Amino acid sequence: FEAAVAYAVAEQLGFDAAGVTWVRTTFDGAIAPGPKTFDFNLQQYSITEERQKVVDFSSGYYDVTQAVVTYAGSPIAEATTVAELKDAKLGAAVGTTSLKAIDEIVQPSQKAAVFNDNAAAVTALKNKQIDGLVVDLPTAFYLTAVEIENGVIVGQLPESASGAEQFGLLLAKDSPITECVTGAVDALREDGTLDELADEWLASAGAPVLT
């Protein structure tokens, strides 16, 4: 999904697919203050006021919810309410809005486990060191389909008091192209392209909202 959005934004800016160059960055490295090795970055970054102090964001390209992932037969596999997660050992990657969602929405009785990245959290889940992990919904579908044998999406967490999250393209602070990139994203939203890409690459079936 992110790659499709990147190519669509590039096209809006006058670049064809051959003109797009991909570079690897870590999640934390890309969001740290300082110069960047990219023009814009898509790693499912939620737009937050705290992050906007050190980087720029485009307007939002996807309205995102957080989801709880586990394995079949786990203590929370059949949960249908947030209350049923209160006593679970949940985990998330450091610095993510997923970790914030555990604390603010679930408010578990035991402190959330914090991992360097989603890969480490998945390993902990496979080893049954945690009952479940919280990630954004697109990642939840990927993990349960590809990474976690007998993986299960317990459900989506309800919206937090601070409102719905949005993913945005991340740019260097005060980047000269932030306005142009935002204009491209806005155009893709207005002409329906973003909705079409979400329908093509993402789905919400099988991920009910926990009450």
Segments from the language model and where they lie:
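Bilobed "Venus flytrap"/periplasmic-binding protein-like clamshell domains
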Residues: 1-13, 45-47, 63-122, 137-142, ...
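Hydrophobic residues within well-ordered alpha-helices
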Residues: 9, 33-35, 85, 125-126, ...
